[in-house]
Amino acid sequence: MGGRMWLPFPVLLLSALPAALLRGAAGFTPSLDSDFTFTLPAGRKECFYQPMPLKASLEIEYQVLDGGELDIDFHLTSPEGRTLVFEQRKSDGVHTIETEDGDYMFCFDNTFSTISEKVIFFELILDNMGEEVQGQEDWKKYITNTDVLEMKLEDILESINSIKSRLSKSGHIQTLLRAFEARDRNIQESNFDRVNFWSVVNLMVMVVVSAIQVYTLKSLFEDKRKSRT
């Protein structure tokens, strides 16, 4: 075929656009996702800070993957120091808030535990971070024709935003499923160790009881009378 490589139509159309216009594509989706897993020792409290703009969306989801009774205290505080969320002895939680301008603080508190450390997973989803409007304006500056193969650039932008939004949602779901899988695996391993421990204990008890029963029965049939000479 002469070494030609055919691209899907949206990619082919984007490849013909100016380079500066393609740089504006970085502003398609103003959504930022990040997840972390850390170990919180017994008797300790760990806090994190997240700067947020005005009227954005902050979603926090957390799970206790391993340790003790899989429980933790969770606190979410506004930039003014006002308590937004206060949960005690929870294994998981999801919270979404509309933000003010400033630094939000969220803490995981394990001070109630004196023995068990906790493995904690949490994910942050930041929406409406103020980049979408600027990204769309960058596109519109380079629109010179009202029609490109009967498809408007706004339609392409909407399609790309929809695809990226769905991909982001799929990645979010996969991250949560991995966290659930890790927690379930830890629970199964803990149950496995407990079953093995108590099985060994029961086996030892059965052996000791059997030995006592054999000794008792044997002593009942022994002739303890001394023979006279």
UniProtKB/Swiss-Prot annotation:
Compartments where found? Endoplasmic reticulum membrane; Golgi apparatus, cis-Golgi network membrane; Endoplasmic reticulum-Golgi intermediate compartment membrane
Q: Which UniProt keywords apply?
A: Endoplasmic reticulum, Golgi apparatus, Membrane, Protein transport, Signal, Transmembrane, Transmembrane helix, Transport
> Lumenal face: residue ranges?
28-196
Q: Transmembrane: is it a keyword of this entry? A: yes
Q: How does it sit in the membrane?
A: Single-pass type I membrane protein
The family note in this entry says: Belongs to the EMP24/GP25L family.
PANTHER family in the cross-refs: TRANSMEMBRANE EMP24 DOMAIN-CONTAINING PROTEIN
- Output this protein's name: Transmembrane emp24 domain-containing protein 5
- This chain's source organism reads Mus musculus
